[in-house]
Structure formats: C-alpha cells, structure tokens
UniProtKB/Swiss-Prot annotation:
This is DNA ligase. Its EC number is 6.5.1.2. Its cofactor is Mg(2+); Mn(2+). Gene3D superfamilies: 5' to 3' exonuclease, C-terminal subdomain, 6.20.10.30, BRCT domain, DNA ligase/mRNA capping enzyme, Helix hairpin bin, Nucleic acid-binding proteins. Residues 599-681 form the BRCT domain. The gene is ligA. The active site is at residue 115.
Length: 681
C-alpha cells in the first residue's frame, strides 16, 4: 500500500478521534455536526477502498465515546518527580537559607509560590502537542491519566506559538491539579442532590476526579491546574525559573499570578507572613509557601537528595485545629498483632475534612496526653492530612469523664495481650495464627499495592473468604478455584454462577504469581520488612529459600537491612505455620526466586560506591542494583572508605566531598566501564 495513503488515513483518523473526544467526553465540540459527519464519511470511504486500514480501534468501528477509558497503566517519568523538604518555623527556614548561601557562596534570588493543596500531575509535550499526563506515583513512575488530563480546562492540547519563546521539541512540565473552592462546593451540592455522599475535602476529590476511568466524569468535575516546575526539556534552557514561567505562560500553560521574586530571607519571611494572613483569600486551598532558588545554574550546583531538591523548601503553615467531644477510646488489632487505641469522637470539620477518628498510638501515649473518655479534646490534622488528638480542654471537665483502661484480652479472639519484650510501648495479641482481626488484615495486606497488588481482593473479599471457610489463612489464596469462590455469596450471581468479580479475582491471582521476589517478601507480613528492605534482600539473595536459610549476621550485612530487620526475618521463618504459607504459595505457582544472570561478574566485591545526581541511562534503583549485583556496596554518603563516586546531573555536595577527599570520580561512561570491567588494575 502507498505510504501516502497510510499517512492520509492516520492523520484523518487522529482528527476524527480528536473531535469525538471533544464531543463525547469534554462536551465542547469545535466543529458543527455536519463538518464532523463529512470527516467521518471521508475516513469511512478510505477504509472501504483500502480494507486493510480498518482496525478494531478505528473511529469508524467505535460507537459514540466508546474507547475513551483511562486504564491507569504505569509510565516512567522522563525526570524524577521529587518531593519537597519542609520547614515549620522561621528558624528552620532561616537555617535552610544559611545552608543554601553557604553552599553557593552568595545570596540568591528566591521565588515564593503558593503551596497548593492538590495532587501532582506531570505533562509531556512533543513539538508542542500533549502526548501524556501522569500522576506522581513513586516519583520514578506514575499512572497514565492522559485522557483525563486533556479534560482539564487549563491544560492545552497544543502549545501556543510564541515569537519570543520557540516551542521546544520536548517539554515535561509539572504542576498541581486542584479544585477551586466554589467548584468543590458546587460538586458536593450536586452529589447531595443525587443522594450520593459528598467529598470530605477538595484535595481528596481532586485526586479521585483525576483517577476516574471514565474521562467524561473527570470533564464534568471542573478541575484546574497550575504549573510549578520542569522535568526534562529539549530545545528549552531557561536561565531562571522565573523565565521558565514566562515561557510557559506564553505557550498557554497555566502559571500562578501569586508568585513573587525576592532577595534575602527577610523578604521571603514577609511573603510567608502575608499568605499566612490571607490564605483563605485565595480561590483554592493552600497549606504553605514554596521557596525556590530562582537561577537554574545555582539549582544545579545545589543538587538534590534522594527525595528532594536542596534548592527548594516548603514552609508549612500550622495545621488547623478544632475541639470536639471524645466519645470513647476503642482499640484495633493490626496484621502483626499490635493493639492500637484510637479516639472515637463527635464528627468535626478540620482543614476541610470531617474527622471522627484519630489514632492514639498506644496506652502510654494516651496517658501522656492526659485525655479522658468524655473530654472535650483539641484535634488537628498534622500536615493538614492526619488527624491527631493534641490533648484535653481540662477546664471543661464536668466530673463525668473516665480513664481509658487498655484491655487485657484481645477484643477479637479473647487471647491475653502482652508486651513482646520488656520495655515495649506496644502490646500485642500473640494469637497471630488464628486471631480473626490479624487474619483479615494479613489477607488484605497481601493484596496491597506494596505487595502483590491484587485489585479484586479488597477488604470485603478478605472477610468473605475467611468467614465462609474458603481459606484458612493467606497461604490458601493462590490455590483458590472457581468452586471455592462459589461457596461465598460475594462471588456468585443470583443464578449461582461465578460473578464477574470472582472471575477477575482468579485472573488477578494468576497474574500476581509472577510478581518479583521483593513483593512476595512484603506480602509475608514480616515485622519491619517494607519495600526498601525487601528490595535489598531480594537483590542480595535472589530467592526466598536463600533468605530463609541465611543467618542473622548474613542478613544484617545487607545494606538497608541491619540487625533489627535481620532478627525479625529469622524469627519469622522459625515458625512452622509461617513456612507453611511459603510452601503453599510455591506449590500454587507463586514465583519465589528472581531470575539471576550468572554471567554478571562479581568484579566490585567489597567496594563502596556512591552515586550522586541523575544518570540519564540509569534510575537510582537500577544503578544501586547494578553495584550490588557485582558484589559492591551502594553507599549513601562519601567517606575515606569510598572507592568511587559516580556523578550525574545535579550532583550536590557529595561531589564536593569526593573532591575534598580525593575519591575517584566517574561520569556515566566511566560507571558503565566500571560495571563491565571492574576497577583498573
């Protein structure tokens, strides 16, 4: 077939799809029905003449808005989306400024921006055309929400041309998605009219609206966006962030009108104080002010830590507080048996959310805070997110209050509670094998995003499977069959057949069997073993059998593990029924070993290597795993014992330390040579 015909079809199909999206999803057509019909007729005629062009996803084969469904597949960011360090006082802000000035040897200009309380979004434009929108995720990869991002009023599908700022070949721009308060209130009013529960606060509703599978719903939610940073760019090298914002505005991207450029920490503090007084005058919620070094060259010199740039900080305002009645103190039992008291309160609105529950951590914390059941208590949302009981308003006591007494028996199974060892603040239910609460929480944990990531296995499903006796514990999950699920009402239809959710659960379980070893380790609910320690163990040992057979000393020697985690791993595998869980999973086909490349040489044995800055060819985890796989130690700080420092973009102070100590410095090419050939003889 002529390539010109294929190109003609591709351009026409893309144009029709664009108009379908504007009509069916955004409800904002830009051409008449007649003009659209003419485009569709031309496309249909072309496919009739060349039938091989007609594909199942062609606009001619889809009805209405069919096909516009957001799947939330994982996509990698071109540059990492870092977080921000926080300052909660003037002293902390001043100390940060002193570190910045000390590192660069001058007083920089700062940009002061409002810290919008929303959800982060990254947009990628290629030659001015929006090709992707993604959530922050873990900073390295996020969820693809491109269709939903296109429905946001502020997000242009094409960048506007500018004589002063040519459109770059590639532009990755970061921003915050949020609700204006009036739009949030209107949304909640409409939900109430439809007898649906309203959202608790604008941030949660923004996050939920951005993650709708049906982008038409997102379009109706009237989300807004403000851009506040750049990722990777090709053909665009601004000297300052201020200049970058001017360019973004010229291209039609939304930038804040409240950003101010100042010099000196005193001027920064003035802006912080001003917005503390006027935070409720803004059309959206804010929870602080972000302060950034404006000059890009100075940003590069300052570099970043593993989680946040050194050239920026978020000044967080004190969280809002409220008083309410403490109706009761109850306890919950977690998956590792920890018994946690929590406050049950008269619902009260704090920082935009309705709060009725708050953790009290342990009995010692209850005593330290001095709260009594029946007290009027002061609560706040730490970071405007987590509800916390600060303490009682003792002057309002009427004599009817009573002390909380920690139960001596598990509220779920009746087993006597105990401290695991002397001096522990927490008490636990030792009936870990059959306590109903621990069983529920462990089964639910197996399905979590940090473990096997089984979407169809929710809390309700975990309860149903255990209640029906379909599973005895989490070890039975991967052996489930359709007949097993039919023993529960949750997974069968009225006619007695397996429901769609049941079929989806079986499919999810089958796919989860191929998850990497570190996820298996997290799913086992070993005390203290989260994703970081699990990755380290999986990288070092490669299979579960080797981890099970390792000594405390061998485990503790793994970087990122240490003695406490090592002892917890050995203790866990010493229990017969724990090992039985692993045996059941292995028998059901769960992969308990990662594929290892024996051809990788152990040519870095005993060498301590530090990686600083970003390497275009390696993620941070990839570089770390490459070092560990060759017997080296991926260290986090530079010392006299460091053999090599690998320097990428924005290296920060580790580079300076390496120069000071005379440590060998490698660029990415040198790092690749080191991995391939080992250190020079």
């Amino acid at each position: 077939m002529d390539s010109d015909i294929q190109r003609q079809w591709g351009e026409l199909a893309e144009e029709v799809r664009g108009h379908q999206f504007r009509y069916y999803v955004k409800d904002a057509p830009v051409i008449s029905d007649g003009q659209f019909d003419e485009l569709l007729r031309r496309l249909t005629a072309l496919e009739e003449q060349y039938p091989e062009l007609r594909t199942p996803d062609s606009p001619t084969q889809l009805v209405g808005g069919a096909g516009f469904v957001t799947e939330f597949r994982s996509v990698d960011h071109l540059e990492r989306m870092l977080s921000l360090d926080n300052a909660f006082s003037s002293d902390e802000l001043t100390a940060w400024d002193a570190r910045v000035r000390g590192d660069i040897g001058q007083e920089p200009e700062y940009l002061c921006e409002l810290k919008i309380d929303g959800v982060a979004l990254s947009l990628v434009y290629e030659n001015g055309v929006l090709v992707r929108g993604a959530t922050r995720g873990d900073g390295r990869s996020g969820e693809d929400v491109t269709l939903n991002a296109r429905t946001i009023e502020d997000v242009p599908e094409r960048l506007a041309k500018s004589e002063k700022y040519p459109i770059p070949a590639l532009l990755e721009v970061r921003g915050e998605v949020f609700f204006r308060l009036e739009d949030f209130e209107a949304l909640n009013a409409s939900l109430v009219e439809e007898s649906k529960p309203p959202f608790a606060n604008p941030r949660n509703s923004a996050a939920g609206s951005l993650r709708q599978k049906n982008p038409a719903i997102t379009a109706r939610r009237r989300l807004r966006m403000i851009c506040h940073g750049l990722g990777r760019a090709e053909g665009f090298s601004p000297e300052s962030l201020h200049d970058a914002y001017l360019a973004l505005g010229e291209w039609g991207l939304p930038v804040s009108t409240h950003t101010t450029k100042v010099r000196g920490i005193a001027k920064v503090q003035e802006r912080v104080n001003y917005w503390a007084e006027h935070r409720h005058d803004v059309e959206h919620e804010i929870d602080g002010v972000v302060v950034k070094v404006d000059t890009v060259a100075l940003q590069r010199r300052l570099g970043s830590t593993s989680r946040a740039p050194r050239w920026a900080i978020a000044y967080k305002y004190p969280p809002e507080e409220a008083t309410t009645e403490l109706l009761d103190i109850r306890v919950s039992v977690g998956r590792t048996g920890r018994v946690t008291p929590f406050a049950y309160m008269t619902p009260v609105k704090v920082a935009g959310s309705t709060v009725s529950l708050a953790t009290l951590h342990n009995a010692s914390e209850v005593k330290r805070k001095g709260v009594l059941i029946g007290d009027t208590v002061v609560i706040r949302k730490a970071g405007d997110v987590i509800p916390e009981v600060l303490g009682p308003v003792a002057d309002l006591r009427n004599g009817n209050e009573r002390e909380f007494v920690m139960p001596t028996a598990c509220p779920e199974c009746g087993t006597t509670l105990a401290h695991e060892k002397e001096g522990d603040a927490d008490i636990r239910c030792p009936n870990s094998r059959s306590c109903p609460a621990q069983l529920r929480e462990r089964v639910f944990h197996v399905a979590g995003r940090g473990a096997f990531d089984i979407e169809a296995l929710g809390y309700e499903a975990a309860i149903a499977l255990l209640a029906a006796g379909v599973i005895e514990d989490e070890g039975d999950l991967f052996g489930l069959t359709a007949d097993d699920l039919l023993r529960t009402d949750l997974f069968k239809t009225k006619s007695g057949a397996l429901s769609a959710n049941g079929a989806r659960l079986l499919d999810n379980l089958d796919k989860a069997k191929q998850q990497p070893l570190w996820r298996v380790l997290v799913a086992l609910s070993i005390r203290h073993v989260g994703p970081t320690a699990a990755r380290a163990l999986a990288t070092e040992f490669g299979d579960l059998e080797a981890i099970e057979g390792a000594s405390v000393e061998q485990l503790a020697a793994v970087e990122g593990v240490g003695a406490t985690i090592a002892a917890a791993v050995v203790d866990w595998f010493s229990v017969d029924w724990h090992r039985a869980i692993v045996d059941k999973w292995r028998a059901a086909g769960v992969r308990t070993a990662d594929e290892r490349d024996d051809s990788i040489p152990r040519n870095l044995e005993g060498l301590s290597i530090v990686v600083t800055g970003s390497l275009p060819g390696f993620s941070r985890d990839e570089a770390k795993e490459a070092i560990i796989a060759r017997g080296g130690k991926s260290a986090s700080s530079v010392s006299k014992k460091t053999a090599f420092v690998v320097v990428g973009d924005s290296p920060g102070s580790k580079y300076d330390k390496a120069v000071e100590l005379g440590v060998t410095i490698l660029d990415e090419d040198g790092f690749r040579a080191l991995l391939a050939d080992g250190p020079p003889a």
